[in-house]
């Protein structure tokens, strides 16, 4: 399956679905979003779409099942939300997160503009990240 590109509206729908199903599994924590999805959701950006939601969230069987089920229901890539970026998120950065919204008892926050810039610079991908 080719990766699907998601617009801002589609990202909001995916987050709504994820939070509804995750809360029904007893999850009530925090989901922290970085990368292109954070830029689409919270900032004025020339970016119109992204292929995934790079996020920090607890990895457990219940949430992984929710993610898998949503991918099956919607016919999208299985890694539509993933934590692959976790090792690249610097910890201890002051004001690193901005509250986005609360959805079904789950706090969704996005990386601050400063954190996004720091991560883009650290990634060292000028061709890919320059438009951002």
What is each model feature region?
Residues 1-132:
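Compositionally biased terminal segments of proteins
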């Amino acid at each position: 399956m080719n990766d699907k590109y998601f617009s801002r509206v589609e990202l909001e729908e995916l987050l709504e679905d994820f939070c509804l199903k995750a809360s029904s599994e007893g999850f009530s924590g925090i989901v922290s979003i970085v990368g292109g999805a954070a830029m689409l959701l919270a900032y004025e950006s020339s970016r119109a779409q992204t292929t995934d939601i790079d996020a920090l969230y607890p990895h457990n069987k219940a949430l992984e099942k929710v993610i898998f089920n949503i991918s099956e229901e919607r016919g999208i890539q299985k890694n539509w939300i993933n934590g692959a970026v976790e090792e690249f998120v610097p910890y201890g950065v002051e004001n690193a997160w901005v509250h986005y919204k609360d959805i079904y008892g789950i706090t969704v926050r996005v990386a601050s503009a400063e954190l996004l810039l720091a991560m883009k610079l650290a990634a060292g991908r000028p061709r890919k990240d320059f438009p951002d």
